[in-house]
Amino acid sequence: MFFNILNKPATWLCASFLVSATASAKELTLDDVFPTDRVLDVQITVAEKDWDKIRHQARNFVSALHEDRKTAPIDGPYEYVTADVTIDGVKFEKVGLRKKGFIGSQSTSRPSLKIKLNHTDKAQKIGGLTNLTMNNNKQDNTIVSQFMGYALFNAAGSPAPRCAFAKVTVNGKNLGVYSHVETVRKTVLNRGFGNDDGTLYEGTVVDFYEGWDGSFERKTGNRDAGLAHIRKIIELCENESVTEEAIGKLVDLDSFYQFWAIEGLLGFWDGYSGNANNFFAYLNPKTKKFHFMPWGADSLFRKRSMLNFDFRAPLSVKTKGRIAYQLYQTEAGKKRYREALHGLLKYHWNEEKLLSECDRIEALVEPHLNREQSRFSRSLRGTREFIRE
């Protein structure tokens, strides 16, 4: 190829160097792909046969919730295909593209997507991030849950992914506004904990039950250390008279109470404390304890759960997650939860600013919506009502 270049006219050579220099100058950073004041432009080009293949792949509800999930993480049915993606004018070639989602967010017309930047070129990434997550907001007609929810977690000192809005087009077709959520890996861990060499687990409809130690999906880190820690927590949770002090030897309580109280404040009915779902647990090598992080936060700003609707359940606290439940059985746990919640209300829950943010987001994303997102403005009224109440 070098010899072919020598035979080209000098003008062509200059143009090629200029293009190369421009591409280099446009190298994206994490801040570039997680803006708060604009909507990302994400254009995907993929062979139509591959697009039809991945968008019709789906989970089977029965197999996804089968009792086999006790012993091993749920297998995903999704496969990668090769595609090109352009983000705000910067092109990434031969990336991996697949569908994502558990059950509620599945769609054949507007699927949630995973983009693997280093699918072919192992060095291809954005500020250390190799995987991009585009959530379709199917379960969140308001579109604001993930953007506002993760922002509050981070502002309150509870590590969480960053989030931005993205207009996603596939082969020129506008799929509407997606939530671009930072994949929980090294970038999140380093920002939140100052390290990334601990053991990270994702929890999807799993909890610390006897015989369920293999159900947590290990993403990074030492398998034996993580599994041993999970088994110790399970042993504790099986003890009806467990103390807060005992739990605190395995779970970082300062961070857990904050995490738990934020889930309650935001009405996160499908998170760890509300449904033993949508969470990450990180065995931090500094503390040698589990720290919890939110995930799948597209079901916020609701007074009550969409599952097991119970008018007797308190609105201010959720205790379906076993650690949350066990802590709330202790007087010390109740006291510390109340303190965490009151602190959030005092320092981070500003009704006027939250309502203003709803207005700002509405104006920001409305021009980019897909027709399937026609309920956006109407649904956003519910979020405003939740904030006011």
PLM features: what roles do these ranges have?
Residues T11-S20:
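Bacterial N-terminal signal peptides
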Residues M1-L6:
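N-terminal secretory signal peptides that target proteins for export/translocation
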Residues A25-E389:
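Phosphate/dinucleotide-binding and metal-coordinating scaffold of catalytic cores
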